[in-house]
Amino acid sequence: MNSMYRIYPEKRYRKTLAILQRFAPKGTSILDLGVRNPFSDVMEKEGYVVSNTEGEDLDLHPETLKDYQGEMVTALEILEHLVNPFGVLQQLPAKKLLITVPLRLWFAKAYRNDKDPRDCHYHEFEDWQLDMLLEKAGWQIQYREKWTHPVGKLGFRPLLRYFVPRYYAVYAQRMTND
């Protein structure tokens, strides 16, 4: 296993990076929504030019995205933290988009951190919900992938995590009026 995965979620990072490499050549400039994070470093180590947003409240001010540039936007575990992801998706300053979100699990409650109101999930999508949201916001889906997230614990719910997909990735391109 590569050393970058010793601390981070190995499967999620590996899958996300593989999708990114499939649709964006090295050297692509990427706006990674959210503050700088460990996966921002992974993308840079793989040859991408990465900038991040600065912690703005994108629900209240999605128009601030127009101040950023990038050939591609990544929103990796970001949309579920937004009250209004539709407004953000409309304002993205690129023609290519890679999104990952946690899927809604029928056997688990939505994630909530009582100590940090920014670290809560307003949405845990079903795949069709994210697809509809993207299409309504002007994006055409080119690729989709789901994967499980085993947690290595004992119990009924941890067992289900071996079989029920937890993450959903979508690569999309902005629709044009041509």
Where are these regions (language model features)?
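Short, well-ordered beta-strand core segments
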Residues: V73, L97-L98
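Short, glycine-/aromatic-enriched active-site segment of Class I SAM-dependent methyltransferases
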Residues: I99-H123
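A short beta-strand submotif of the Rossmann-like class I SAM-dependent methyltransferase core
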Residues: M72-I78
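Conserved N-terminal segment of class I S-adenosyl-L-methionine
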Residues: M1-M72, F86-P93, P117-M132, Q142-D178
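Short N-terminal helix/helix-N-cap motif within the alpha/beta-hydrolase-1
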Residues: V83-G87, K109
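Short hydrophobic-aromatic micro-motifs
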Residues: L98-I99, V170
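Flexible, active-site-proximal loop/turn residues at the rims of small-molecule/cofactor binding pockets
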Residues: L79, V88, L103
